[in-house]
Amino acid sequence: MISKKTLITRDNFDKLILPIYNPIPFIPIKGKGSRIWDQKGKEYIDFSGGIAVTSLGHCHPILNKTLKNQSKMLWHLSNIFTNEPALRLAKKLLSSSFASRIFFANSGAEANEAAFKLARYYSSKIYNFKKNKIISFYNSFHGRTFFTVSVGGQSKYSNNFGPKPAGIVHASFNDINSVKNLIDHDTCAVVVELIQGEGGVIPANLTFVQALKELCKQYNVLLIFDEIQTGIGRTGKLFYYEYYAITPDILTIAKSLGGGFPISAMLTTNEVASVIAPGIHGTTYGGNPLACAVAESVIDIINTKKVLSGVEKKSKKIISELNIINKRFKLFTEIRGRGLLIGIVLKPNVSRNIHKILNFSLSEGVIFLTAGNNVIRLAPSLIIKELDIIEGMKRFYRALEKYLSRKE
């Protein structure tokens, strides 16, 4: 047993934690805004945002105050009761979206699990039990439960766990003919990320999403938008589907919703929700007062003209800085994404060294993510300061200099 007085080190992870992760060598102990500090006091500028989670940066004072105040009132009740923070949050999310009903959970995987179950349940009740096929897309990612990871289009995450859930097929992203070859009257849902995050920060084409909507209407199929990564202001609108002017039947959100506190939600219409009765689905912690109070404050801050328009401005600044860097080093083939979900596509001869580039970046004090095998992903705070953007890009520049001057 490790006492509180014993120094905690990265080595403790290897001895104590199930090795499903391989954390970077240092341990962060403090964060403020878009900067974090490790045990040795070294400072880093965070462009990872906890994988698009810390939408308002680290330890935002309003979120701190909200959490502290709610912790003095109610922590947990279970869904034998409802609670005021959950109902207030529900009102705000529903009034800002297409939806009329909402279900709260704790993670993106749980929200997607609920969405897939709802789609099958609705179709079995309204049509017939054979209408249960779910169409997803190659390179998509929808969570780590066995159902959601099977729906996801990356077999490396779902292989070797035994028989997979049946009735799941995969089409090629942005290829409507691929969907046409799979969809039929036994299909209950098509689920799509409007930007494939884990798959490489690849946006869905407008014509592709329009055609998906029409196909779903033709076959009485529910259209599910997975906005776990793009939702809650990440792209400069509260929900990314607003850019397409196309509404889904079911929407899932998480990550930015809690600003770092675990919460997710599934939103849907009165029509789809009409088949649900008590006991059909559930959660112990979902919609708890602490999470919902924090998420309400997140929405109050983000769902404003100042913050949402600021996302676009910050995005343009980052992309401008990246273009300057690329003009110097010529390592990128493309910079893509929307708002503050940005993908830097590396040239083929560079992408094999993507982790070396990230390690050089860490040594310079700037944190990035990967997306796929050849993309550096940026998903910083939606309110990251321009000073942090400029300094972060300077550090990235120095990291690339060192990468190019390295000796193998």
Swiss-Prot record:
Binding sites annotated in the UniProt record for pyridoxal 5'-phosphate: G108, A109, F141, D226, E227, I228, Q229, T284
Q: Name one Pfam family in it.
A: Aminotran_3
GO biological process annotation, one example: lysine biosynthetic process via diaminopimelate
Output the InterPro entries linked to this UniProt entry: AcOrn/SuccOrn_fam, Aminotrans_3, Aminotrans_3_PPA_site, Class-III_PLP-dep_AT, PyrdxlP-dep_Trfase, PyrdxlP-dep_Trfase_major, PyrdxlP-dep_Trfase_small
Q: How is the cofactor bound?
A: Binds 1 pyridoxal phosphate per subunit.
Q: What is its EC number?
A: 2.6.1.11, 2.6.1.17
What does the entry list as the binding residues for N(2)-acetyl-L-ornithine? R144, T283
Catalytic reaction annotation: N(2)-acetyl-L-ornithine + 2-oxoglutarate = N-acetyl-L-glutamate 5-semialdehyde + L-glutamate; N-succinyl-(2S,6S)-2,6-diaminopimelate + 2-oxoglutarate = (S)-2-succinylamino-6-oxoheptanedioate + L-glutamate
Q: In which pathway does it act?
A: Amino-acid biosynthesis; L-arginine biosynthesis; N(2)-acetyl-L-ornithine from L-glutamate: step 4/4; Amino-acid biosynthesis; L-lysine biosynthesis via DAP pathway; LL-2,6-diaminopimelate from (S)-tetrahydrodipicolinate (succinylase route): step 2/3
Necessary cofactors: pyridoxal 5'-phosphate
UniProt-annotated location(s): Cytoplasm
Its Gene Ontology molecular function terms?
Answer: identical protein binding; N2-acetyl-L-ornithine:2-oxoglutarate 5-aminotransferase activity; pyridoxal phosphate binding; succinyldiaminopimelate transaminase activity
Q: Which UniProt keywords apply?
A: Amino-acid biosynthesis, Aminotransferase, Arginine biosynthesis, Cytoplasm, Lysine biosynthesis, Pyridoxal phosphate, Transferase
Q: Which residues carry this modification: N6-(pyridoxal phosphate)lysine?
A: K255
GO CC term (a single one): cytoplasm
Where would you say this protein principally sits, based on its record? cytoplasm
| Quaternary structure and partners | Homodimer.
Annotated family = Belongs to the class-III pyridoxal-phosphate-dependent aminotransferase family. ArgD subfamily.
Record function comment? Involved in both the arginine and lysine biosynthetic pathways.
What name appears for this protein in its UniProt entry?
Acetylornithine/succinyldiaminopimelate aminotransferase
This protein's species is Buchnera aphidicola subsp. Acyrthosiphon pisum (strain APS)
* The organism's taxonomic lineage, starting at the top: Bacteria, Pseudomonadati, Pseudomonadota, Gammaproteobacteria, Enterobacterales
Gene name, Swiss-Prot/TrEMBL: argD
